[in-house]
């Protein structure tokens, strides 16, 4: 192709970039913000397995990106579904990879997310923080794009028979945060996530015993054990 780098040159460049990245990690020459967000690690490593899911497995079609400002604080409010909160991760990839300004979505998560080993650290590294008004206001005042899924565990814990029916929102602290910071509220609709883990039942007794919000039973979870966590392919639309 005209203008394309020769394969050996492109490979050498990638190797050099990787070695430079590893050198920065070893020497500590990288930045982490006050919330624990590590931009370089997120973009180069943590988002890498999500991109094939976005483009190939879910074939995400993103609409309405022109409604997202290039700069300044704004609050994205989306529906929540899919048993496992992959919808939030796909929304983040949509904004980072496909918005002209490559905007990073700073997601607000429940307490349980940050209390869970590995998951909590991953969430912090990718820019998420606790779903509370003070943190939301601090991010909005800094000009960040903040994402919230106000249905919370009720959204991801509903049976397949209630797919695409909005559940009761939380207390609405995110609205007051947007009002106090004079930030626009941008609705986001996600279609396709309901089909990736069709829920048959929610074993609430087991959930209480294990100290979690939901113990989901789907056509593959827990029957196939770790393999059951592989989401079913579906066509997604994310519209702002």
Q: What do these predicted ranges mean?
A:
Residues 2-105, 109-134, 203:
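Membrane-anchoring hydrophobic helices of lipid-metabolizing enzymes
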Residues 120, 158-162:
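Short acidic, glycine/proline-rich loop/turn micro-motifs
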Residues 122, 138, 176-180:
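Hydrophobic/aromatic ligand-binding patch that stacks against planar heteroaromatic rings
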């Amino acid at each position: 192709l005209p203008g394309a780098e020769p394969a050996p040159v492109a490979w050498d460049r990638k190797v050099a970039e990787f070695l430079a990245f590893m050198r920065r990690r070893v020497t500590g020459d990288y930045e982490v913000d006050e919330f624990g967000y590590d931009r370089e690690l997120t973009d180069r490593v943590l988002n890498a397995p999500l991109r094939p899911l976005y483009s190939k497995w879910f074939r995400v079609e993103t609409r309405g990106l022109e409604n997202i400002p290039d700069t300044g604080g704004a609050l994205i409010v989306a529906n929540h579904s899919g048993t496992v909160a992959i919808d939030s991760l796909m929304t983040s990839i949509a904004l980072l990879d496909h918005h002209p300004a490559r905007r990073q979505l700073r997601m607000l998560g429940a307490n349980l997310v940050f209390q869970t080993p590995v998951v909590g650290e991953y969430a912090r590294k990718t820019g998420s923080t606790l779903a509370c008004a003070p943190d939301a206001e601090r991010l909005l005042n800094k000009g960040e794009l903040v994402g919230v899924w106000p249905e919370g565990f009720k959204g991801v814990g509903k049976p397949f028979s209630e797919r695409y029916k909005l559940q009761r929102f939380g207390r609405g602290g995110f609205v007051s945060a947007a009002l106090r910071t004079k930030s626009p509220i941008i609705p986001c609709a996600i279609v396709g996530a309901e089909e990736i883990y069709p829920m048959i039942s929610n074993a609430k007794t087991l959930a209480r015993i294990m100290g979690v919000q939901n113990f989901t039973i789907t056509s593959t979870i827990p029957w196939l054990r770790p393999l059951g966590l592989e989401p079913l392919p579906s066509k997604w639309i994310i519209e702002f």
